């Protein structure tokens, strides 16, 4: 009777909570995705730290632009995540044509969001950055921060289209259960970003500061 009771509890546990194989598979998929998202957010963190060594105005300008880019990142993430729901279902059913269509939608949606964001940044970049600035001390620091922010925004905009395309491809790969590849790509991106930031911000050897 005790054996039957334990078996019954085990069956309830598996139905309601899941078995070890499920959690192992889940962790193998989820952990690389968690690490990738953390690494992606680490890029702006590194930028703020390194630029902060140059001065308060530079730090303020970069931090403000990173806030704007963060909103853009959320918009792209929402666009590709919505289509990923269908993409995962298509792939699970073996409908590769439907999976291809979902990828196309993600790519077009991400590029559309990017086009809208770039249009706003080009036409209203100064106004958007100015929303974060108030010259309470009246010492001209806000104008300096605004100038640095506008300069930094022009540089960041260069990478928006590659970022959008990368997000579309990365989510498509994740739908197939391959979450390790995007994580490795994120490590490579953060590593190259950190090295280039250090070289271009502080100047090493022939590279000007």
Language-model region placement:
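Interfacial/gating helices of multi-pass transporter permease domains
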Residues: 51-70, 102, 140-151
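Residue-level signal for short hydrophobic patches within transmembrane helices
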Residues: 19, 23-42, 46, 68-75, ...
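Helix-loop interface residues and adjacent transmembrane-helix termini in multi-pass membrane transporters
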Residues: 42-45, 53-56, 90-93, 175-176, ...
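Short membrane-interface helical motifs at transmembrane helix boundaries
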Residues: 116-154, 204
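Single conserved hydrophobic/aromatic residue that forms the stacking wall/gate
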Residues: 1-13
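Residue-level recognition of transmembrane alpha-helices
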Residues: 30, 63-66, 110, 153-156, ...
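Membrane-interface helix-loop junctions in multi-pass transport and translocation proteins
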Residues: 190-209
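Small-residue-rich hydrophobic transmembrane alpha-helices
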Residues: 59-122, 163-182
